[in-house]
């Protein structure tokens, strides 16, 4: 079993863990969720801008930049068409049944590209692969919390909510497996996933931080970015 697949399995487990937080009534960790989202926003933004994008543009030039934009807009389109109600964190009020289904469908594409990002990172090198994995892992638990709570709020059972988080994990693993087999994803996967990662950091996570208006959340964004820089330096500083 290759390293990318092992890391994808770990990321999938974090999705399920996020679902367990909700389905087992362990709801006392909202502050922890908030800080984790802020830390993940800073780390993911740094990974996308300082590691994934430079390598993508160095290898593919202007054409790669277009592919990055396609990845960004693809997630934007799916979230605004399928999941207009989507936001990271726990859903606390009742929503319609379609909202739960659409949230799961939209996130399945997103988590598939999490797997593509992990596989593409490891195809470049172990340093980039590991840093991309950490960035993805940091938002996997809030992601599991999100889909489980939205499904519960839309009238689904706890078993179905937990099954939804497991489906997200399966999509991540599939992203790795498909990338390993599909030549087009091997060539363009890093550029696409750079766009997806940039969208998740800048358009999903950062608005959650800004909405909180919390000093600790704002600081954690900087801590997340600083931790990326430290890890990048310790691992050799070469994407």
Locations of regions flagged by a protein language model:
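Intrinsically disordered, metal-sensing/regulatory segments
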Residues: 1-239
């Amino acid at each position: 079993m290759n390293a990318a697949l092992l890391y994808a399995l770990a990321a999938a487990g974090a999705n399920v863990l996020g679902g367990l937080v909700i389905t087992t009534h362990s709801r006392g960790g909202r502050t922890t969720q908030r800080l984790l989202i802020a830390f993940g926003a800073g780390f993911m933004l740094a990974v996308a801008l300082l590691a994934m994008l430079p390598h993508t543009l160095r290898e593919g030039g202007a054409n790669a930049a277009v592919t990055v934009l396609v990845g960004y807009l693809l997630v934007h389109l799916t979230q605004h068409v399928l999941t207009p109600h989507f936001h990271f964190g726990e859903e606390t009020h009742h929503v319609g049944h379609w909202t739960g289904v659409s949230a799961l469908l939209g996130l399945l594409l997103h988590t598939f590209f999490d797997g593509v990002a992990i596989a593409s990172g490891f195809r470049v090198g172990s340093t980039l692969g590991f840093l991309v994995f950490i960035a993805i892992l940091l938002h996997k638990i809030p992601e599991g919390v999100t889909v489980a709570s939205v499904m519960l709020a839309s009238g689904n059972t706890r078993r179905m909510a937990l099954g939804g988080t497991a489906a997200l994990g399966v999509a991540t693993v599939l992203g790795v497996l498909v990338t390993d087999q599909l030549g087009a994803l091997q060539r363009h996967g890093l550029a696409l996933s750079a766009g997806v990662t940039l969208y998740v950091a800048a358009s999903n996570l950062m608005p959650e931080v800004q909405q909180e208006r919390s000093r600790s959340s704002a600081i954690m964004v900087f801590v997340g970015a600083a931790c990326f820089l430290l890890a990048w330096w310790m691992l050799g500083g070469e994407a």
